[in-house]
Amino acid sequence: MPTLELVHSPHAPDLCPITIYYREFGRGRPLVFLHGGWGYGLYPFDEQIEAFQNDYRILIPDRSGYGHSTRVAGEMRLDFHRRAAEEMISFLDALGIERAVFWGHSDGSVISAMLGLEAPERCECLILEAFHLLRRKPGSRAFFDRFAARPEDLGEETKKLLALDHGEEQWPTVLQRNCTAWFRLADLVKRADEDLYDGRLGEIKVPTLFLHGSLDPRTEPGEMERVRKEMPQATMKFVSNGKHSPHSELGAFAECNALAREFLLSQA
């Protein structure tokens, strides 16, 4: 289990140093996978490791507060995505990596987009899967309300995977920190169209692929259409029968991988 130490991370500002656990496979151009808000274990990138490890050096870090990395208590900061992006730059620095392909899933896609905005020189290209644009997502509120209050209501297999990832005592905290951060973001919204990027999404100049499940339950009506308008230069692909995690879904991962490979080859 490789780890590295960061002197400081804005994603865990009250702790130092920070230990970051990461998975590493293959060799070649660096390809960094950024997990979603509930961690890596629930939506693993096993199929992508198999498909891409012969051509890429695959790195999959647990952000601080997740998995085997330094545990973090208390509320997440409202700008946790930006802070996580800064942590990922420090992660690259610690490994001596100048530039990488970033493939982010869900919250990880937001973090990847912020890397594209704030550190484009570190990004070879971006794959943004199950992307979030809006700060307030009414269609998901009941889902997150339920499991933030009663994480034990999750299915047994889901709880088992979360416990394996974060620990039996820690996984409910991981869920509650993420869910309540999204609640607080939503509750501060003054206009329904406020986005996570302060209107700057269209400033991303890094080559970008949006990879989205056609049946993603976490997507608001019109959300991806607005993304298309704000980033007409990006490639947008919808995965047939894909839900919120096409990369790990049995009926979607093969199409997901094919679309990603086509995009990556176009950037070679």
Regions from the language model: what does each represent?
Residues V110-E118, C123-G155:
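Flexible "cap/lid" loop of the alpha/beta hydrolase fold
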Residues T180-R200:
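Active-site nucleophile elbow and catalytic-triad environment of alpha/beta-hydrolase enzymes
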Residues Y197, V206, E220-K229:
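Short alpha-helix in the alpha/beta-hydrolase fold that links the catalytic acid
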Residues D46, I60-W103:
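Active-site loop/oxyanion-hole signature of alpha/beta-hydrolase fold enzymes
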Residues L215-T219:
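Acidic catalytic loop of the alpha/beta-hydrolase fold
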Residues D14-R71:
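Conserved HGGG/HGGXW glycine-rich cap/lid loop of the alpha/beta-hydrolase fold
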Residues I204, F210-H212:
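Short beta-strand/loop motif that positions the catalytic acidic residue
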Residues G242-N257:
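Catalytic histidine-centered segment of alpha/beta-hydrolase-like enzymes
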